Amino acid sequence: MLRTTLAPLVLALALALPAAAATPESWPTFGTQGTQFVRDGKPYQLLSGAIHFQRIPRAYWKDRLQKARALGLNTVETYVFWNLVEPQQGQFDFSGNNDVAAFVKEAAAQGLNVILRPGPYACAEWEAGGYPAWLFGKGNIRVRSRDPRFLAASQAYLDALAKQVQPLLNHNGGPIIAVQVENEYGSYADDHAYMADNRAMYVKAGFDKALLFTSDGADMLANGTLPDTLAVVNFAPGEAKSAFDKLIKFRPDQPRMVGEYWAGWFDHWGKPHAATDARQQAEEFEWILRQGHSANLYMFIGGTSFGFMNGANFQNNPSDHYAPQTTSYDYDAILDEAGHPTPKFALMRDAIARVTGVQPPALPAPITTTTLPATPLRESASLWDNLPTPIAIDTPQPMEQFGQDYGYILYRTTITGPRKGPLYLGDVRDVARVYVDQRPVGSVERRLQQVSLEVEIPAGQHTLDVLVENSGRINYGTRMADGRAGLVDPVLLDSQQLTGWQAFPLPMRTPDSIRGWTGKAVQGPAFHRGTLRIGTPTDTYLDMRAFGKGFAWANGVNLGRHWNIGPQTALYLRPSSARVTTRWWSSTWTMLHPSVRG
């Protein structure tokens, strides 16, 4: 979805706002008093917008926060995605785009309160709802449960996070005014002992003096809330009155807030781009504010699920199926993926101003964008020439068993023909391409509810390869409890189990080790690269319509997945990935043309 006007390219792969910005050390006190929030003891209405800082290039945090102020907001809400800050168990990374403390300080510098949502479960259309992949390699561990292994891992994460943000909590003079416990648990289960465990983990980590809260759908409040803990409600446009009626009936003596007012929606691969009614949302949002309720716009800006961080939906009803989300988290939000105001911006800004009577600050200067010339990809390298040392296994195992988190994995065995019949792969996680002697014979997609394909093996010995991509672990619904990726079932050919396999983990962490580059055409799964001089680094999109399915790097940074089934056709190139000389790599299973567009 190309949200900025850019030509195609050819590529290688209180009701009032705070009067002035306060410093964290002098931030006003915040709390609750009966049915009202209070700031320095005075009634205060939260006007909030969601910004997932890990989805926004750090260089643009200030710009997005200034635009939140320009909308008329006084607060921002953000998740912290556990899988980014603890990619390997016990190895925490709060640097760069994971620097939550720096984001909070920048919000404070712009005069904005911060609502922090650490999870550990986030949902957010994010890979596994934020759970790190290494969790799913621990046997039959049960996430979102009282499994001691899960609770211990969650506690370690919260302890590490608390050290980063302790000085920024409101009771320490900082702008973090509220901290969420878990996330929409009522839509998942109703184990109140588990929720109590979560609250206890927050207290133990050092959030004991913070204003803790839960958020749930209006019909799930009884399942996901805790006594003596603030409850907020989440809902879609058109549901405001009924949702608040239910919240007030459930908790009549507490402040009234919508924790997520869904001012947009997310996209799935192979489905149309979400387009929602901006005018209806602005009118309903104004109604919410006129009732004196507090509100959080979800999303103010969606941003991008860079790398392999998009999630997937799969609920547990008979009509549902696995549905991976796109790399772009545009969300049809107030700002588009690249931070440009959409038509919703003016409508929401005017609605807020009519209620508050306050004229918000002006928007910052527009972001500079660039149109790049067509650039051919002159070099290619076959995946078959870039396989790692194989691991011998009797039957296929999920990638977590090999210490792998994301990317692809190849399974290989030898078959003696002639053979013909259905090749059963089972519950593929998530897309499998099948090759006989490195020639493609078909695919099996979880998204399409496929479990097998017909194959014909000629006489003699032949190599069977099954290349599996993890397209995004489930982030919502009960099926997220099993987050394994790759092949998880025995492979059968005409009902006979195939044994004696090799596994080749392909996490695709960097293009630096790719070998066998050639200027000749390469068939099958391959890498393609080219170099482009772009001058001063600015925003642009890479038009990937010339490719089939794959992902792209720019100067070693994984920009995310592309897929010609849409609706997303272009990848956002953040300026930190663009240099005067930029080298593009694209890894594809199929390429439609010998050149690409950007």
UniProtKB/Swiss-Prot annotation:
It catalyses: Hydrolysis of terminal non-reducing beta-D-galactose residues in beta-D-galactosides. Residues 1-21 form the signal peptide. InterPro entries: B-gal_1-like (IPR026283), BetaGal1-like_ABD1 (IPR048912), BetaGal_gal-bd (IPR048913), Galactose-bd-like_sf (IPR008979), Gly_Hdrlase_35_cat (IPR031330), Glyco_hydro_35_CS (IPR019801), Glycoside_Hdrlase_35 (IPR001944), Glycoside_hydrolase_SF (IPR017853). GO terms for biological process: carbohydrate metabolic process. GO terms for molecular function: beta-galactosidase activity. It is an enzyme of class 3 (hydrolase). The active site is at residues 184, 260. Optimum pH is 4.5. Its EC number is 3.2.1.23. Keywords: Glycosidase, Hydrolase, Signal. Preferentially hydrolyzes beta(1->3) galactosyl linkages over beta(1->4) linkages. Belongs to the glycosyl hydrolase 35 family. This is Beta-galactosidase. It comes from Xanthomonas manihotis. The gene is bga.
